[in-house]
Amino acid sequence: MVVGPRGSIKIGRDKSNEMMVNSTKASRVHARIFERGGNFVIADQSSNGTYVATDGNSREVSLRREETVLGERGYIGLGAPTEGHGDHVLRYRLEARKP
């Protein structure tokens, strides 16, 4: 999935999302990823929270209607922690692309 400058993607169960997931733990519109100031940010918009585990950092961030800057790569848990890597967990990697 590509998110460019001033772009964003919505993640959730609903078909209107750019990234649709099939997990009962995820909300219809669960989270949004967007670019701000050269960083990629994830904003939780769910009922059950979003969890972010960045590779190289043992501490998982729990979001409840909050946002955080994404690290270079890691895991996103939709509605539950990333431990166990079930159908609610997304693996992500950020990379710069030339226009």
Predicted regions and their residues:
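Generic beta-strand structural signal
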Residues: 3-5, 35-36, 44, 71
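Short solvent-exposed loop/turn micro-motifs enriched in small/polar/acidic residues
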Residues: 2, 24-26, 61
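Generic structural signal for coil-to-beta-strand starts
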Residues: 38-39, 75
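Short, surface-exposed charged micro-motifs
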Residues: 30-32, 41, 67
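Short, charged beta-strand/loop "edge" motif centered at a coil->beta-strand transition
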Residues: 6-37, 83, 89
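C-terminal boundary/linker segments immediately following FHA domains
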Residues: 46, 52-99
